[in-house]
Structures are given as C-alpha cells and as structure tokens.
C-alpha cells in the first residue's frame, strides 16, 4: 500500500492523482482494515498531498464511512477527527460529515449521549463558512433530544437555551414544535411540574395534523395531555395548581385518559389513599419518583401536600398528632409541611405551637373578591365596546 500511495503522490495531473487515490480508498474500505485506513488518512493529511486534494479525498472518505464495519467505523472516525484537529479550520465540512455519520451510528445503537457528544463537536459559530440559522437550530434541538433520551436534562437544557435565541425567528414549524416538546420535557425533569404541565397542555391542543413533512399523531397529543395531567398532580398544592386542575378537568379529552380517576379525585380535593397513590405511581417516570434529601420521594411530597390541602377543606382546625395519622406521616413532619405551605401562600391558615394545633382559614371571601374583580373588568370592557359602537367605530369580535 505504501508503494501505491507513493506512486499516486508522484502523479502530476491533479485529476488523475485524485482518481488514483480514490481507487486506493475503495480498496481500503473494501478490506475493512483499520491499520490500512489509518495509513491512508495519515498520508492524505501529510505535506505530500496538496490541501485541495486532501479535502476532496477526505470528503469522499467521510461519505463512504458506512462501508466499514461499525467498530472499524468508530475507530477510524475518531482517529481521523484527532488527526485533523490541529488543522480543523481547513477541514470543517469534512469533520461535519464524519461527526454526523458517527452520531448516526451511535444513535442506531441507542448510545444517545455519545451521539449527542459527537454532534456537539460541530462548530456552529464558524467564521470560515456560512452556517444557516435553521441548521444551527436543528442541530441544537437534535442534540437536546438525544440527551433527553438518556434523561440528561442538564446537558439538554444547555442546547435548548442555545436554540431559544434562534427559535423566535424560525419559520420552520417542525423545529418549533420539537423545541416546545424538548422544553416541556426539560421542565418536567427539573421538577418544575406546573410550568411543564402548561407546556404539555399547549402541545396537546395543536389542531394541525400535518406540520411540514411531519404527521401529528393523535397518540402523541394524548401523551402530551396525559403528561400535563401527571405534572399538575405532582406540582406543589396551591391556588395555581388548582386553576390548572380546573382547566384539565373541564377538558372533555381528559375523561378518556387512564389517569382520569385520580385527576377527578385531586380536582375534587378528595383525600387520596395509599392504593390510589400506588396505582398512580405505576404510570410515572423514574425522575417523577426520585428521592428527595429528606428521604421521601417527589410523589410522596406531592400527595402529602394534596392531602393536607384537602384536609383544610374538611376541618376548621386539627391537632398535629391527628393530622399526622390522617396523612400517615410523623406529626412533626406534618407541622413542617403545613408551615411551608402557609408561608408560601399555598394554604390559608395559622399554627398554634403551644396547643399543637393548625387552624385553617376559609378562602371563600377571597374567591368572591376575585369574581367581583373579573366581573368589574368585563363590565368596563363592555362599556368601552358600547362607546365605540355609538361612535360608529368597528368593534372587533
């Protein structure tokens, strides 16, 4: 092989030189011999071969990588990327093709993080070549989706944050939808459940069934709706959660979901018993059942807070030992959780530590005041529209 490479480098005509090298490359790829492939790469990157020829040959090599056995592909691709690194500015296009090929191979083997890491090595801010914003956005989203397959929300978020600067100007509806799904999943995995629920619910309301080349499957929309319900149930109990629960409960589509029975009980502020909680637990993903510093789980915390809020609707006051029995937890833990919820305005009440009693306050007055404010706003809006109509101005409907 060394002789063949030497003979090829001695050819004066550039076109003939490239054709001869391509014949050698074809032979190397057919042999699936790693050492021969490495020698070929070393040679075409050496000073014996002009840069313009090296680029063409490396491009051909990158495009034909799939002819090699998977393990050989990985070895030679990594070797090539290492060899061109000192001169990567001269071989950006070729490095891009190699990284995409290798990432595709890792993805086919479900090595999600390795695929993401390979793609993250692509220089999206190159000053040597024009990089389209659409391409940048697609790569950032692709990398984020790969990390999410490995439940790596930290690295996924880093690339979704990069995508956020590009998506506002994007006209590509498929990429925009993929961005929304990734963002919702990241919020979910970071346990920002209420924000995630709102994102999932927005996705579930998509009316189009064809976006670009992508068909919107009914099952995917149902999964998004189910995820919205799950995240809302897991969110910290309080007024915001109650409003989202009301929206979901009134959505007729939710009645067809497997988790509808628990949605109904949570919305109606019923106390949930262990068998119901265990049944709900079976539908959760690992991060939604993760352990917290106090050795409880995300699910435990959500269910205790829900049951505590439900108890506040049933009792005017209750002793902490009785509350602990009701919630099936230590009375001191019940007191701490209640204090946190009251302090965060997620539950109305006060604690008498001397008597070891929690007093619950009725929030009916606050709701009536809220209704009056909404009614006043609607009346003011009607007055404005009536005034516009009297003046002959067009009134938007």
UniProtKB/Swiss-Prot annotation:
Q: Output the superkingdom of the source species.
A: Eukaryota
Which BP terms does GO give this entry?
negative regulation of photomorphogenesis; positive regulation of G2/M transition of mitotic cell cycle; protein deneddylation; red, far-red light phototransduction
User: Where are residues bearing N-acetylmethionine located in the sequence?
Assistant: 1
Q: What InterPro entries does the annotation carry?
A: PCI_dom, PSMD12-CSN4-like_N, PSMD12/CSN4, WH-like_DNA-bd_sf, WH_DNA-bd_sf
Stored Pfam families? PCI, PSMD12-CSN4_N
Annotated ranges, domain PCI = 197-365
Cellular localisation: Cytoplasm; Nucleus
Q: Which UniProt keywords apply?
A: Acetylation, Cytoplasm, Developmental protein, Nucleus, Phytochrome signaling pathway, Signalosome
- Extract the PROSITE patterns matched here: PCI
Main localization is cytoplasm
Question: GO cellular-component terms in the record?
Answer: COP9 signalosome; cytoplasm; protein-containing complex
Q: How does it assemble?
A: Component of the CSN complex, probably composed of CSN1, CSN2, CSN3, CSN4, CSN5 (CSN5A or CSN5B), CSN6 (CSN6A or CSN6B), CSN7 and CSN8. Interacts with itself. In the complex, it is located in the center and probably interacts directly with CSN1, CSN2, CSN3, CSN4, CSN5A or CSN5B, CSN6A or CSN6B, CSN7 and CSN8. Interacts with COP10. Binds to the translation initiation factors TIF3E1.
Stated role = Component of the COP9 signalosome complex (CSN), a complex involved in various cellular and developmental processes such as photomorphogenesis and auxin and jasmonate responses. The CSN complex is an essential regulator of the ubiquitin (Ubl) conjugation pathway by mediating the deneddylation of the cullin subunits of SCF-type E3 ligase complexes, leading to decrease the Ubl ligase activity of SCF. It is involved in repression of photomorphogenesis in darkness by regulating the activity of COP1-containing Ubl ligase complexes.
- Membership in a protein family: Belongs to the CSN4 family.
PANTHER family found in the cross-reference section: 26S PROTEASOME NON-ATPASE REGULATORY SUBUNIT 12/COP9 SIGNALOSOME COMPLEX SUBUNIT 4 (PTHR10855), COP9 SIGNALOSOME COMPLEX SUBUNIT 4 (PTHR10855:SF2)
- The name under which this protein is listed is COP9 signalosome complex subunit 4
Organism, as annotated:
Arabidopsis thaliana
